[in-house]
Each structure stands twice: as structure tokens, then as C-alpha cells.
Amino acid sequence: RPAGGRAINRRSMLKGVGGIAALTAVGAGGSLTASAPAQAAGLSVVEHQDGGRMQYYRFSTPSIGWNPAVNVLLPDGYNASRRYPVLYLLHGGGLNADFRAFDYEGIRDLTVGRELIVVMPDGGKAGWYSNPVSSNVGPRNWETFHMSELIPWIDATFSTIAEFSGRAVSGFSMGGFGALKYTAKYYGHFASVSSHSGPADLRGPDGGM
């Protein structure tokens, strides 16, 4: 599902995608597999579009006040009898930046021949990959959606290496912050992290945003 968005630096994207290349060797033997059904992750699929390599899903979840979505890019010749490493690719913020921008900027071509699954989740326009203390637009707990619901759902739905050695996370701008935050806070979830133009600290001089 392509959509307009801010231009993405292709060199940075290649580096981000390349960050998981080593995992294909590390996790090739594969291993921890998810045995729970997909719905146990707390997500209900309300829409699915099969685009060949690109699979689009939209969910109902109590964590978000609307139906968030995700693009899942499968490798060429995806085979459910094999196990694949997964790259979680997090988008930046702003009105014209969302998870679909990666497809618009050519992520399919950039990953040709790479034996990995790329997961590009919705993160909101200014969600900062966090659970806000309060919200006047209903729940928007992006951190819970990504870390407690989406990752287990991905592992239950696709043939992944469902352990530390089989996951990497990369992001751009706001997504770069999210990649750093998730890796630091959820130790043992990701074997590789890369942040491109992502702030490491959101606090201003007075300790606020």
C-alpha cells in the first residue's frame, strides 16, 4: 500500500536493512517457535490485503483507539518450513510520514535477495513509540501494541526465528528514537539496532519535551 511521504535516505535504509544480514548466519539454525495462536497476542485482524511479497494487515486492539496497521514484507520464495530473521523498521513522525512510506520509497527493491522478513508497523504521527500518560483521543499505547502484541503475533503468524538472535530493529527520526528505546528497555529482544537521525533523548534543558 504505497503512500506519499518524506523522502528516505536510501543509503541509510540499506545500512538499516543490512543490520540484520548477519542474523541470517547467527540464527540460521533457528529455534524458539511460537506455539500460541495468533489471537492470543490481543490482536484481531479486521483487514488483510495479499500483495504477494507485501502483506498488509489492519487490526483491532484495545491498545489503540482506532485500527492500526502493518506492512509485512516477505522474502522471495518465502517457505513456511524455514525460519527467517525479522527486521522491525520504524517510521518517522509528521503528517506525511507513516509505515507505508517505506513501500513508496522502494523497500521491495532494496530487499531483493535478502532472506529476511521486514515488519513496518504503524506508529502514529507523533506516537514516539510510547504509552502516553494521558490522551484526549482514546488509547494510543504504541509501545504496548508493538512490544506486547505485534511481535508475538508476527512470531505466531509467520515462520520467524522467534528469539533474540533472529530480531533486529531500525528506525528513522522518531522511529530511530523508538528503535533505541525498545532495545534498551526490552533487553534481550533484539540482537541488532540502528537509528538514523533519531534523537537519543527527548528531554529539553528543563527536563521536559
Please describe what each predicted stretch is.
Residues 1-8, 19-26, 34-36:
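N-terminal secretory signal peptides
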Residues 12-23, 38-209:
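Non-catalytic cap/lid and distal C-terminal segments of serine-dependent acyl enzymes
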